[in-house]
Structure formats: C-alpha cells, structure tokens
Amino acid sequence: MLQPPLNQLTSKINSKYLIATTAAKRAREIDEKPESALLTKYISEKPVGKALEEIADGVVFPDELFLKTY
C-alpha cells in the first residue's frame, strides 16, 4: 500500500503527474545527497518514499525543484 495515501498527496499538489515528477526529482536529490533530508524521521527507507513523505508533509513543492538552476 502506498504511504502516504494518494488523497493526502493530492491535497498538497493537484496533479498526479506533478506529484510523480516532483517525487522523482526530489528522490534523485536524496539519493545523491543523503544529508539533504528535510524531515527528522521517515517511514520509508527508499528515496522515492522519502520524497513522497516530504510532499505529504508540505515540505517540498514543485516550484522549488523545477525553478532551481544547476
């Protein structure tokens, strides 16, 4: 079962596509830099799960990730 639930995620970001792309991009950041964690405790051990938890908690928003310049 997906944790956090999809309805909790869609309450933060309307589009399922935007949730998926935001989670994927944030998961790559977490994978590359584990110290970039924004929460003190995660339920999931995998980067995608951690990214979804951050979205559900309202810590990560699509604009922050897609406007970032590399």
Curated annotation (Swiss-Prot):
A Pfam cross-reference name: RNA_pol_Rpb6
Entries under InterPro entries matching the protein: DNA-dir_RNA_pol_omega (IPR003716), Pol_omega/Rpo6/RPB6 (IPR006110), RPB6/omega-like_sf (IPR036161)
Gene Ontology BP annotations: DNA-templated transcription
Catalytic activity: RNA(n) + a ribonucleoside 5'-triphosphate = RNA(n+1) + diphosphate
SMART domains associated with the record: RNA_pol_Rpb6
EC code: 2.7.7.6
Keywords attached to this entry: DNA-directed RNA polymerase, Nucleotidyltransferase, Transcription, Transferase
GO cellular component: DNA-directed RNA polymerase complex
Keyword Transcription set for record: yes
Gene Ontology molecular-function annotations: DNA binding; DNA-directed RNA polymerase activity
SUPFAM superfamilies: RPB6/omega subunit-like
Keyword Transcription belongs to the record: yes
UniProt record similarity statement: Belongs to the RNA polymerase subunit omega family.
Assembly information from the UniProt record: The RNAP catalytic core consists of 2 alpha, 1 beta, 1 beta' and 1 omega subunit. When a sigma factor is associated with the core the holoenzyme is formed, which can initiate transcription.
Purpose: Promotes RNA polymerase assembly. Latches the N- and C-terminal regions of the beta' subunit thereby facilitating its interaction with the beta and alpha subunits.
Name of this chain's protein: DNA-directed RNA polymerase subunit omega
Organism per entry: Staphylococcus saprophyticus subsp. saprophyticus (strain ATCC 15305 / DSM 20229 / NCIMB 8711 / NCTC 7292 / S-41)
Lineage of the species this protein comes from: Bacteria, Bacillati, Bacillota, Bacilli, Bacillales
Gene behind the chain: rpoZ
